């Protein structure tokens, strides 16, 4: 499943079920108009929070990798709303 607007692109990757039976989902977020790596995130449905954000190892040390975290903090609420919508309509 894919969501795309003028600012970013969110792609559903997979669902994970951990040992506590919590449902969590892995998504990627690609912020447009900036040359930054794609941010991966894990969203916990039961807690309604993003529990983890990370960049693939191959991109960790490029000059703009730290910028993606700061930029994501500016759009995090909007991304969570879209993720909830995507999960509800799967």
Where are these regions (language model features)?
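Acidic, low-complexity intrinsically disordered segments
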Residues: 49-90
């Amino acid at each position: 499943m894919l969501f795309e607007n003028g600012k970013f692109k969110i792609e559903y990757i997979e669902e994970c079920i951990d040992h506590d039976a919590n449902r969590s989902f892995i998504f990627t977020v690609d912020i447009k108009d900036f040359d930054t790596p794609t941010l991966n995130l894990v969203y916990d449905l039961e807690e309604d929070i993003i529990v983890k954000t990370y960049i693939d190892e191959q991109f960790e040390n490029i000059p703009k990798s730290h910028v993606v975290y700061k930029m994501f903090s500016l759009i995090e609420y909007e991304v969570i709303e879209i993720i909830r919508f995507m999960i509800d309509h799967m």
